[in-house]
A protein has these predicted regions:
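Transmembrane alpha-helical insertion/packing segments
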Residues: 1-100
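Extracellular/lumenal glycan-associated context and N-glycosylation machinery
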Residues: 16-20, 24, 87-89, 141, ...
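Juxtamembrane non-transmembrane "cap" segments at the membrane-aqueous interface
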Residues: 137-169
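Alpha-helical transmembrane spans of integral membrane proteins, capturing the lipid-embedded, hydrophobic core
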Residues: 59-67, 128, 189-197
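Cytoplasmic juxtamembrane interface segments
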Residues: 98-141
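Hydrophobic core segments of alpha-helical transmembrane domains
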Residues: 96-104, 194-195, 199-201
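Transmembrane alpha-helical segments in integral membrane proteins
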Residues: 30-44, 182-212
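Hydrophobic alpha-helical transmembrane segments
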Residues: 162-195
Length: 213
């Protein structure tokens, strides 16, 4: 059998068009689908914990862990031997509250919502709950700053210079906010939403290709 070759102009246009779409699908959709399969696998591991403990159990566990951290940091801030600003305690308390609430909302959206609710709410709130612990740990542990806060600062500079330069957004952010203390937690909470939506979309793409059982 010989290879078919387009002869007329419409055939040539259609042939080139479909080949271009196929190439784009191979270069773009295939890697995204593979990423979706990987994300779905690890998300299922986290979801199994939510299934065993339930929404109330997961929320209670997060409340105990984050509450213990907040109380411990408050106790340290009251010691005269340690120079810990009260603002640092408030930053830890606020991040603890956000992380606990995010855990509860992610678990609730996954349990009671459909696919749309999972993409719109569950993944972003789950990312927030995952991102905040290392950031808060770095805020209260100076030894971790070089591993968490300094790379976060470099990432913020890169995003401002290469993505948010449109319309002078980067200049406004630099003039309005200062990246220190609780601002690191706010930064990662902001990143978690677009990243969560992206991961939710690639998982939905993977489900279209091969639905999960």
């Amino acid at each position: 059998m010989g290879k078919w070759k387009p002869e007329s102009l419409p055939q040539k246009i259609g042939y080139r068009g479909w080949s271009t779409l196929g190439m784009l699908g191979l270069l773009v959709l295939y890697p995204l689908t593979v990423l979706g399969f990987a994300t779905r696998y690890y998300a299922s591991k986290l979801d199994s914990t939510r299934t065993r403990l339930g929404v109330v159990g997961v929320t209670a566990l997060a409340l105990v862990v984050w509450g213990a951290l907040t109380v411990a940091w408050w106790a340290l801030s009251t010691m005269e031997q340690l120079d810990i600003p009260f603002d640092a305690f408030l930053a830890v308390a606020a991040a603890s509250g956000v992380a606990t609430l995010s855990t509860a909302l992610a678990a609730s959206a996954k349990k009671f919502g459909g696919r749309l609710m999972t993409v719109v709410f569950a993944y972003p709130f789950a990312m927030t709950a995952l991102f905040l612990p290392p950031v808060v740990a770095a805020l209260v542990t100076p030894e971790l700053e070089a591993y968490v806060l300094e790379p976060s600062y470099d990432l913020a500079v890169w995003v401002l210079d290469n993505i948010l330069f449109v319309g002078g957004i980067n200049e406004w952010l630099r003039a309005t906010f200062e990246l220190e203390g609780a601002a690191y937690a706010a930064m990662w909470a902001g990143i978690s939403f677009p990243l969560g939506w992206f991961l939710g979309i690639v998982v939905a793409l993977a489900n279209l290709v091969r639905p999960s059982e």
